[in-house]
């Protein structure tokens, strides 16, 4: 990531020998990690993930003072826990009352799909996250499942009630996205549901180079 974590590491070294974290430290760690979200392939990613793991594991859930401190930053804790694939952190934040549909540029469920984290995606859906929310990326979760070719999460979203006819501002539908990626399994899955295809797009289908897609959709 762009910023160094020297100060953060010094804070961690200071509390290594303590039995539990203090309120100021918990806030500092969460705030520092939040500053550097969404650089998925950063060289610092694993180090930051390990930092969060150490932090989460040091939380004493029986310490009311610590929980009160975390409650003030529950949404921030929630989003960084999703980003760094920390299930324990996610559950702590949600049980503290974090907003399930809280988004910091990218929605939590979009992050879990991009990270290919099925279990976290399932947790978020079980807790009632919106399946059709469009975040700052301009896409809803079903589109992220399609564009990452994540068939398992796509099917789970479909079974969980995601809108398969959801239309973006540019009038693109999930079917059109699946055709773009040439994912035959997803195209067949959508076709079985008789998903809407824009009339203008239908005219272009016969000209597709992928004849298998043409055979499936042009009847």
Swiss-Prot record:
SMART domains for the chain: ANK
ANK repeat copies, ranges: 104-133, 137-166, 170-199
UniProt KW keywords: ANK repeat, Repeat
One Pfam family matching this protein: Ank_2
Protein name: Putative ankyrin repeat protein BB_0399
Organism field: Borreliella burgdorferi (strain ATCC 35210 / DSM 4680 / CIP 102532 / B31) (Borrelia burgdorferi)
């Amino acid at each position: 990531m762009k910023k160094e974590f020297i100060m953060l590491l010094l804070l961690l070294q200071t509390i290594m020998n303590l039995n539990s974290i203090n309120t100021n430290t918990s806030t500092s760690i969460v705030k520092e990690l939040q500053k550097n979200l969404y650089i998925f392939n950063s060289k610092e990613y694993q180090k930051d993930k390990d930092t969060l793991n150490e932090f989460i594991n040091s939380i004493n859930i029986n310490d009311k003072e610590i929980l009160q401190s975390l409650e003030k930053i529950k949404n921030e804790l929630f989003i960084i826990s999703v980003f760094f694939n920390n299930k324990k952190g996610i559950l702590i934040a949600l049980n503290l009352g974090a907003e399930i549909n809280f988004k910091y540029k990218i929605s939590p469920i979009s992050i879990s799909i991009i990270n290919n984290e099925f279990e976290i995606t399932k947790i978020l859906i079980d807790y009632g996250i919106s399946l059709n929310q469009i975040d700052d990326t301009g896409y809803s979760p079903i589109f992220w499942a399609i564009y990452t070719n994540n068939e398992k999460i796509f099917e789970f979203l479909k079974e969980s009630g995601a809108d398969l006819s959801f239309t973006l501002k540019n009038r693109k539908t999930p079917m059109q996205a699946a055709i773009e990626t040439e994912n035959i399994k997803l195209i067949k899955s959508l076709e079985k549901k008789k998903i809407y295809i824009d009339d203008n797009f239908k005219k272009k289908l016969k000209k597709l180079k992928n004849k298998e897609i043409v055979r499936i959709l042009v009847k």
